[in-house]
């Protein structure tokens, strides 16, 4: 009698393994994955080996735990940056810019940096211009601190320990203990600010965009402090959160 797993195409089994690894939100052991995808250990072990060879899965050094690999992360970024999926997100950002009058952007975590996925610029001539696909640091940007703060604890601590905490302005947080306190406040408040920490004279406020299980992206507004002091930027939190809810619906269907 054919085994159940033999009736499922290998490609679909591989997809289910990748989905399980992403859903785990931390490196998973073979036994954990076996119960998640309901495949025999020998079958799953062989499949993980093939996925590891392809760069879609990585194995922790000195451990028997698996995590999503760099190639899988790159595929996810490519999907998000694909023009065919950006029209609705762009429309949400355009409406937000029309309401606030300042540049708004949609960002995601990309390794130890933030990547700008979508962005709509203000009409003001004085502005900071960044193109989609640009990267900025985590520890001194509103989106970066927000995404870092909302990661699972083990992932957040591991990633934070790797950050160089370079100084960009007099306001940049360069002390690990102080950054940890800032991230704790962000988790409680569910928003983050950049008060001239990345660029002198520039402020930013970011709110989370919910994925199926946790925040997977950030929506932010930024402007010169001479035009939008931080207090005024914070007054737009309700507007940003409404837009973030609309953005979430485009990601989760």
Language model features with spans:
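N-terminal helix-turn-helix
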Residues: 1-82, 86-87, 245-253
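Short, structured helix-loop boundary elements
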Residues: 7-11, 30, 65, 69, ...
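Amphipathic alpha-helical regulatory segments at dimerization interfaces
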Residues: 20, 88-99, 185, 189, ...
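A structural signal for short hydrophobic beta-strand segments in well-ordered beta-sheet cores
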Residues: 57-59, 106-107, 209
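Amphipathic alpha-helical effector-binding/dimerization core
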Residues: 63, 67-163
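Intrinsically disordered, low-complexity polar/acidic regions
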Residues: 168-169, 200
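Extended hydrophobic
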Residues: 174-243
């Amino acid at each position: 009698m054919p085994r159940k797993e033999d009736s499922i195409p290998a490609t679909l089994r591989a997809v289910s393994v990748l989905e399980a690894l992403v859903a785990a939100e931390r490196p998973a052991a073979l036994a954990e994955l076996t119960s998640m995808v309901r495949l025999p250990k020998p079958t799953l072990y062989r499949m993980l080996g093939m996925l590891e060879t392809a760069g879609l899965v990585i194995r922790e050094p000195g451990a028997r735990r698996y995590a999503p690999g760099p190639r899988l992360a790159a595929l996810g970024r490519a999907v998000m940056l694909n023009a065919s999926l950006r029209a609705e997100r762009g429309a949400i950002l355009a409406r937000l810019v029309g309401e606030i009058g300042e540049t708004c952007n949609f960002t995601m975590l990309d390794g130890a940096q933030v990547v700008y996925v979508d962005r709509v610029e203000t009409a003001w001539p004085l502005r900071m211009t960044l193109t989609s696909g640009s990267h900025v640091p985590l520890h001194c940007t509103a989106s970066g601190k927000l995404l870092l703060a909302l990661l699972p604890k083990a992932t957040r601590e591991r990633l934070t320990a790797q950050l160089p905490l370079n100084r960009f302005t007099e306001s940049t947080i360069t002390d690990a203990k102080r950054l940890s306190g800032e991230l704790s406040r962000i988790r409680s408040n569910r928003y983050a600010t950049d008060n001239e920490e990345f660029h002198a004279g520039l402020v930013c406020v970011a709110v989370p965009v919910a994925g199926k299980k946790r925040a997977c992206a950030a929506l932010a507004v930024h402007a010169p402090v001479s035009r939008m002091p931080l207090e005024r930027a914070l007054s737009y939190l309700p507007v940003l959160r409404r837009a973030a809810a609309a953005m979430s619906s485009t990601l989760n269907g």
